[in-house]
Amino acid sequence: MALTKAEMAEHLFETLGINKRVAKEMVETFFEEIRQALESGEQVKLSGFGNFDLRDKNQRPGRNPKTGEDIPISARRVVTFRPGQKLKSRVEEANAKK
């Protein structure tokens, strides 16, 4: 099961007692800030969680799986996420308990 933005907003509503509309706006604003930073080429560092980085990938050869035809895969910029040590540790601990 995946955690959704709606579930995050609901959790804020329940734990902080703020109104649902405000909770939804907080979640949307959080993600919009991350989007804007990445769009402007900035790294996003969330202490205790991880880093969102931009990585440039060079053009490379590819192949159409249906036809076998060689096609170039164009150069592009991708977003990568590197989890922080605290997040890694918590995930490992949670998996060890299962």
From Swiss-Prot:
CDD domains: IHF_A
SMART domains for this protein: BHL
Biological processes, Gene Ontology terms: DNA recombination; positive regulation of metabolic process; regulation of DNA-templated transcription; regulation of translation
Ranges for region Disordered: 49-71
An annotated Gene Ontology molecular function: structural constituent of chromatin
SUPFAM superfamilies (UniProt xref): IHF-like DNA-binding proteins (SSF47729)
Pfam family, one: Bac_DNA_binding
Summary of the function given for this chain in its UniProt record: This protein is one of the two subunits of integration host factor, a specific DNA-binding protein that functions in genetic recombination as well as in transcriptional and translational control.
Family: Belongs to the bacterial histone-like protein family.
Self-association and partners: Heterodimer of an alpha and a beta chain.
Name of the protein in its database record: Integration host factor subunit alpha
